[in-house]
Regions:
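C-terminal structured "cap/appendage" subdomains that terminate the fold
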Residues: 683-738
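Conserved beta-strand -> loop -> alpha-helix junction used to position metal-binding or nucleic-acid-contacting
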Residues: 161-179, 186-189, 470-474
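Conserved pre-motif C helix in the palm subdomain of viral-like polymerases
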Residues: 227-234, 658-681
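Nucleic-acid-processing active sites and adjacent nucleic-acid-binding tracks
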Residues: 98-142
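Acidic beta-strand-to-loop metal/phosphate-binding motif
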Residues: 75, 139-150, 441-443
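Short, low-order "capping/linker" segments at domain edges
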Residues: 742-758
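Conserved "right-hand" nucleotidyltransferase catalytic core of DNA-directed polymerases
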Residues: 2-113, 160-165, 182, 190-194, ...
């Protein structure tokens, strides 16, 4: 439990003493192997003896904070009992002031003798007062590794809100520098490789199993804790050194204008939270339980005739590993489903041999359709309905987190709960997220964000002109592809009636454009268009001939990746695709096989496995001239027989080449959406209206606003969203909707208080 009950979303720092959590007031239960854990911590402490300080004296902490204020910079890290920012308290924190030893400040470590909080530590309230002194210091910066976690923990556990101080997050900075290399690395790994150039130290989990850190004497844990703050600052210095190189000017701009300013924006969004309609949630739980049970009954109905075979199988194999099947069959077990579908029912086994969504659709049998329905209902229940219990706060709100770099493209992702992944055909579930009493939710997303970005990246004159005229791009492309007028390719007639033929033509044009953006081959496009390959090729050729910028953007993106190992967005963000720098095939002699290698020439050792450039060029040319995989494999085997190793990158290059243009589009969309959030968050006009951000779902921002202010707020939100792309050649539009709940009946902003159904859209690009 947290030390003091928080009241979200209007929490303010209170003057009342911060209590020790009840869970830490009780005598701790014994932990197995605690002696071993303490011995390991002691050994580490002795290794770094004299390099770090453990501070348990108030005057020493005051003096240290004075130094930080004077230097206007510190590294900061927290140590907690767990990863739940709302429940797991900070037991100690570390600071690193330039020119001084890093320190660890213990607060809630347990005594080995009493099992209760050791009294020989600094009080939480006093520590909070000292940390809060950093607020308001002009030019102050704090270095973190995973800033959102530490900043949230300090706030919800200690009442210390450092959100308005300039924050450097080494984790984000290193991820920006290389989206491939630093995706999963942690502080210890990165610091060892780029700063200390030594073998990394032990990670937290390697030294301290869950729930044991604050059970170790703080004199032994201080070195571990203090080092984290020091390493975070040193890694920030390294990252800035890289970002400030001339060739990385675009990345530096992304950090300083997008990622760093976004950190406190996302914290404020999580703090506000969104209200859940419990009555509607209960209604959906009943509905989806019924759907799950019905789907399960359908599955049983389909395999019922095979029960004798199932029983024979069970008699034959019993509990043999890999052969187990229960009765009734466990629908949630992939292993049992494989046995049921492929071994017992004899359904055609897909090439993958799996029972995932794609495989089940390929099987195309009533039982596979029922399994898919079962899984979807189960997913809705476990993730978005029943599973919401663990995220609900006492006031009926959920405070989900947002991973700032949730994807390599720069897109955010939602966690705890993941509200981004609610399927569009189950969007009714979104209606259980509601505005607080007396308020509306304002949802605003970009109209055709990705095709507009495609036009900007392609610099195609016709595409740009289409948008500048306020026309629909896909309809214009469809008119060219099908030799008809623009009006015949719109989804609706001038009177508002749905025009099915126009909608179909527009949809086919959209398929072609997206096919180019996603690097799809003609057969794949033909399959989506439901036409022959020849017909798809004709349409494709006509579109690319009339809109040459599409293929130009595709080629330029692939060439950029080949030359640099990454592609860039319109704002300078990078998506690394390093395989693109390789040749499709690379050659080298096996050890000792180079006929020109002279063992008595010391300068020749480095090239002992290298082929001549002429040989490489010949072999590569030969392989590229072969059309069929079988012929390529035979050629490669011939080289292997000569002692030449061949590395085949062709498949990986093919895969990554399809991502090049799409990565630039998706990354540019991420940049735009993040800039929009920053603009909305800092807009003083919206603050005066008490309108604030709640959620970001892909390119859709969701704000909450008092009912009486919603018209004015919409004007400012649209303005903020559209101006972030004002430097691009294509105008961007945003479409606002106002409702009492997410995806509810839209409020007509022309007439106060009246509701009208927003329908399924107006034919704009998605």
């Amino acid at each position: 439990m947290p030390r003091r009950r928080i009241s979200l979303p209007t929490r303010t720092v209170e003057a009342t003493p911060i209590e020790v959590p009840k869970s830490l007031q009780k005598k701790a239960k014994p932990v197995k192997d605690m002696d071993t854990i303490i011995a390991q911590a002691k050994a580490m402490s002795e290794k770094y003896a004299g390099q770090y300080d453990c501070v348990t004296d108030k005057d020493v902490l005051i003096d240290y904070v004075d130094t930080i204020i004077s230097e206007k910079r510190t590294g900061l890290d927290t140590e907690t009992t767990g990863l739940n920012i709302f429940k797991d308290p900070v037991v100690g924190f570390s600071l690193y002031a330039p020119g001084r030893k890093a320190i660890y400040v213990p607060m809630l470590h347990l005594s080995r003798f009493t099992g209760k909080v050791d009294p020989n530590q600094l009080p939480v309230e006093f520590c909070a007062q000292q940390l809060n002194r950093l607020n308001g210091v002009p030019g102050m910066t704090i270095d973190y590794f995973n800033a959102p976690f530490d900043m949230n923990e300090l706030w919800y556990s200690m009442g210390v809100k450092l959100w308005d101080i300039c924050s450097n997050d080494a984790s984000l900075m290193m991820r920006l520098l290389n989206t491939e290399r630093h995706r999963n690395n942690n502080l210890k790994d990165l610091h060892a490789e780029f700063c200390s150039h030594t073998t990394r130290g032990p990670r937290f989990g390697e030294l301290f199993p869950p729930g044991t850190f604050n059970r170790c004497p703080f004199k032994y844990t201080s070195a571990y804790g203090a080092r984290d703050a020091e390493m975070a600052s040193e890694l920030v210095d390294y990252a800035y050194g890289e970002l400030r190189k001339p060739e990385n000017a675009g990345l530096l701009q992304v950090w300083e204008t997008i990622e760093r300013p976004l950190i406190p924006v996302l914290l404020r969004m999580r703090e506000k939270g969104v209200l859940v309609d419990e009555a509607k949630r209960a209604e959906f739980i009943v509905k989806y339980r019924g759907l799950k049970e019905a789907a399960e009954a359908d599955v049983v109905h389909e395999y019922e005739p095979y029960i004798p075979k199932i029983n024979q199988w069970r008699m034959r194999f019993g509990r043999t590993k890999g052969k187990i099947i229960d009765m009734p069959v466990k629908i949630g077990s992939d292993g049992q489903l494989k046995i049921l579908l492929y071994d017992i029912m004899g359904l055609p086994r897909p090439e993958s041999g799996k029972v995932d969504k794609h495989a089940l659709k390929e099987i195309n049998h009533p039982i596979s359709a029922a399994i898919l329905r079962y899984r979807e209902a189960a997913k809705m229940l476990s993730t978005y309905l029943e599973g919401l219990d663990k995220f609900l706060h006492a006031d009926g709100t959920v405070h989900g987190g947002i991973k700032q770099l949730g994807a390599d493209t720069g897109r955010t992702s939602a966690v705890d709960p993941n509200m981004q992944n609610i399927p569009s055909h189950n969007r009714e579930i979104r209606t259980m997220y509601i505005a607080r009493p007396g308020r509306y939710l304002i949802s605003c997303d970009y109209s055709g964000q990705e095709p507009r970005l495609t036009a900007s990246l392609s610099r195609d004159a016709k595409m740009i002109e289409t948008y500048q005229k306020g026309q629909d791009l896909y309809s214009m492309i469809a008119a060219v592809a099908f030799n008809t007028t623009y009006e015949e390719c719109l989804e609706k007639r001038p009177n508002g009636e749905l025009y099915l033929e126009g909608k179909e033509r527009r949809g086919q044009a959209k398929t072609i454009v997206l096919g180019i953006c996603y690097g799809r081959q003609i057969p794949s496009i033909a399959e989506q268009l439901k036409c022959s390959v020849d017909e798809a090729q004709l349409i494709y050729d006509k579109v690319t001939k009339n809109f040459p910028g599409l293929l130009r953007a595709q080629d330029e993106s692939a060439q950029m990746a080949h030359d640099k190992g990454y592609v860039e967005t319109l704002w300078g963000r990078r998506r690394h695709l390093s395989i693109m720098m390789h040749d499709p095939y690379e050659f080298r002699y096996k050890d000792g096989c180079n006929p020109d290698f002279d063992p008595f020439d010391p300068e020749g050792f480095s090239d002992s496995n290298e082929l001549s450039e002429a040989a490489k060029k010949k072999y590569l040319g030969d392989l590229m001239s072969l059309k069929w995989r079988k012929d390529k494999n035979e050629y490669i085997q011939g080289l292997v027989a000569q002692g030449i190793e061949v590395k085949d990158y062709s498949y990986q290059i093919s895969e990554q080449s399809r991502k090049c243009l799409n990565a630039r589009i998706q990354g540019s969309a991420a940049d735009m959406s993040k800039l929009a959030m920053i603009e909305i968050d800092k807009d003083e006009r919206l603050k005066k209206l008490d309108c604030y951000l709640l959620l970001m779902i892909h390119d859709e921002v969701i704000c909450e606003c008092p009912i009486e202010n919603h018209k004015e707020a919409i004007t400012y939100i649209k303005e903020d969203m559209e101006k972030v792309a004002s430097q691009l050649p294509v105008p961007f539009k945003s479409d606002p909707e106002t409702a009492p709940c997410w995806y509810g009946q839209e409020v007509d902003i022309e007439e106060d208080g009246e509701l009208e159904d927003d329908g399924d859209g107006d034919g704009e690009e998605v």
